[in-house]
Amino acid sequence: MEIWYTEKLELEKGRAVSYRVTKTIESLQSPFQKIDIFETQSFGRMFTLDGVTMVTNKDEHSYHEMIAHIPMMSHPNPESVLVIGGGDGGTVREVLKHPSVKEVVLCEIDKAVVDISYKYFPECADAMKDPKVIHHYDDGAKFARDNKGRFDVILVDSSDPVGPAEVLFKEPFFRDMASALKPTGIIATQAESFWYHGDVITSLFEFIPKIFPEYGYYYTTIPTYPSGIIGFTFLSNAIDPYAVTPDPKRVPKGLKYYSPEIHKAAFVLPEFAKAYIKRKG
């Protein structure tokens, strides 16, 4: 008998995506969310939170490389990095590929995510064992609020704006992050798909221009996320994302998705999606 895992998309009512499961590896309920690990026919090992796909062996690199390397390559010398969420370790792994980095603070509210990632996704999670990585298991907004002016780059590797992640899409959280940045710092946050979540993106860019003088939206392609793409905000007090020309000499070796050409192209949006982003001028 065939077994299928079906993800009913919370933010896209009336839609679902199914994957053939060859093995259910582990299921557990943490204090914050339900965690499942499957072996799938098409995407290898799959990690879900509350029935929503987070990571698969086949395509995780496109998400992790793009949330990390776009801001890291845009900053002239990123030394101190905060990752909020991202307990699977993939974003931390990519950040550590930049030799300028001296510390990475991982602020993950759910320690169970980290523990199960060590067990089943070592290709992502083992990076979190690096001595440069500081683990902090707490609310990301509070941590940002308590660390003013500390970070060159802040990356918010969050799930969708429901449940414990909902606060990460609200104006107070973005103000807390702004206070934690150094003057030339950059923030990138998971910001949904322009195909299905125009309302979410529009709501973000209603308040973002009030906080950051420089901002933009970019995206990556990833087949296991709704619509096959996922977007990110790019926020800064000093660095215009549309004016950045990445230095090819700084690109980490062995990447599977990111390149200087992809960097520039990621900010080019279809006409309908441009309407979601309030740009000055």
UniProtKB/Swiss-Prot annotation:
Protein species of origin: Leptospira biflexa serovar Patoc (strain Patoc 1 / ATCC 23582 / Paris)
The protein's name in its UniProt record: Polyamine aminopropyltransferase
GO molecular function, one term: spermidine synthase activity
GO cellular-component term (any): cytosol
Pathway: Amine and polyamine biosynthesis; spermidine biosynthesis; spermidine from putrescine: step 1/1
EC number: 2.5.1.16
UniProt binding sites for spermidine: H64, D88, D157, S158, S159, D160
Coiled-coil residues: none
NCBIfam families: PRK00811.1 (NF002010), speE (TIGR00417)
Record carries keyword NAD: no
Protein family according to the UniProt entry: Belongs to the spermidine/spermine synthase family.
Keywords from the named record: Cytoplasm, Polyamine biosynthesis, Spermidine biosynthesis, Transferase
A GO BP entry: spermidine biosynthetic process
Presence of keyword Transferase: yes
Top EC class of this enzyme: transferase
Residue numbers annotated as active site: D157 (proton acceptor)
Location within or outside the cell: Cytoplasm
Function comment: Catalyzes the irreversible transfer of a propylamine group from the amino donor S-adenosylmethioninamine (decarboxy-AdoMet) to putrescine (1,4-diaminobutane) to yield spermidine.
InterPro entries in the record: PABS, PABS_CS, SAM-dependent_MTases_sf, Spermi_synthase, Spermidine_synt_N, Spermidine_synt_N_sf
All residue ranges annotated as the PABS domain in the record: 2-237
HAMAP family (UniProt xref): Spermidine_synth
Major location category of this protein: cytoplasm
UniProt binding sites for S-methyl-5'-thioadenosine: Q33, E108, D139, G140, P164
Subunit structure: Homodimer or homotetramer.
Catalytic activity: S-adenosyl 3-(methylsulfanyl)propylamine + putrescine = S-methyl-5'-thioadenosine + spermidine + H(+)
